[in-house]
C-alpha cells in the first residue's frame, strides 16, 4: 500500500507531509496429521511499515491504571499496552497444534507466537511472546482461550525510550460464533 501525503507532523511552525508505505510477505500452513485427526498450523509474516519519521503507536486494552494526563508521556509501565505499530520492520511467527477431537467433537489446541519489531523510534528491538491453549467445542463454534503474554516496557525520558522490566499478562477469553 502506498499513499502520498497520507501522514503529517509538525516541525517548528511548519506542517510536513510524508507518504504511507506498507509492504509484507507471509506464509501459511494448515496440515492434517495422523489421518486428519490432528492438525498443525503455522504462520510467518514479515512487514515493512513506513508511517513517517519515528512514528510509534501503542496498542492495548483500555485500562483504568493508565493516566489520561498527556504530560505523563508515553509509558507501558501501567496497563498492558505495548508498541504495536510504527515505522520499521516486524517479523511475526505462530505455531499451533490441535489434538484429535473427543467423541463430542471437543479438542485442545496449543500455540505459541513471537513478534519481533525493529522500530525507528526505539533503540531496542520490541519482542513479544505469547503461549496458550484453546479449547474448541461444537466444530470450532465455541472457544475458550487461555493466553500467557510476555512483553517489554519502556519509559520516555528526555525524548528517548528507556527499556524497563518485562511484564507478564494472562488473558482468559470466551468466543462464540453465531450462525
Regions found by a protein language model. Give the residues of each.
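Transmembrane beta-barrel architecture of outer-membrane proteins
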Residues: 20-24, 90-92, 126-130, 167-171
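Internal helix-turn-beta structural module
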Residues: 134-167
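Outer-membrane beta-barrel architecture
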Residues: 26-28, 94-96, 132-134, 147, ...
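Detector for outer-membrane/organellar transmembrane beta-barrel domains
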Residues: 1-120
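A generic structural signal for short coil/turn motifs at secondary-structure boundaries
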Residues: 119-122, 155-157
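Small/polar glycine-rich anion-binding or flexible loop at a beta-alpha turn
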Residues: 112-115, 127-130, 149-150
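Flexible, surface-exposed loop regions and adjacent strand-edge segments
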Residues: 57-67, 126-130, 161-166
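Outer-membrane beta-barrel "beta-signal"
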Residues: 165-179
Amino acid at each position: 500500500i502506498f499513499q502520498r501525503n497520507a501522514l503529517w507532523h509538525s516541525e517548528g511552525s511548519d506542517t510536513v507531509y510524508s507518504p504511507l508505505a506498507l509492504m509484507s510477505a507471509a506464509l501459511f500452513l494448515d496440515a492434517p496429521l495422523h489421518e486428519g485427526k490432528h492438525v498443525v498450523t503455522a504462520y510467518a509474516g514479515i512487514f515493512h511499515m513506513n508511517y513517517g519519521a519515528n512514528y510509534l503507536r501503542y496498542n492495548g486494552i483500555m485500562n483504568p491504571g493508565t493516566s489520561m494526563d498527556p504530560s505523563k508521556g508515553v509509558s507501558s509501565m501501567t496497563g498492558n499496552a505495548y508498541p504495536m505499530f510504527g515505522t520499521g520492520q516486524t517479523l511475526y511467527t505462530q505455531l499451533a497444534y490441535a489434538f484429535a477431537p473427543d467423541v463430542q467433537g471437543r479438542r485442545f489446541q496449543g500455540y505459541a507466537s513471537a513478534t519481533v519489531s525493529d522500530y525507528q523510534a526505539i533503540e531496542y528491538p520490541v519482542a513479544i511472546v505469547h503461549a496458550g491453549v484453546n479449547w474448541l467445542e461444537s466444530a470450532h463454534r465455541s472457544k475458550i482461550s487461555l493466553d500467557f503474554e510476555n512483553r517489554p516496557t519502556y519509559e520516555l525520558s528526555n525524548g528517548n525510550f528507556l527499556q524497563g522490566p518485562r511484564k507478564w499478562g494472562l488473558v482468559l477469553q470466551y468466543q462464540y460464533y453465531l450462525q
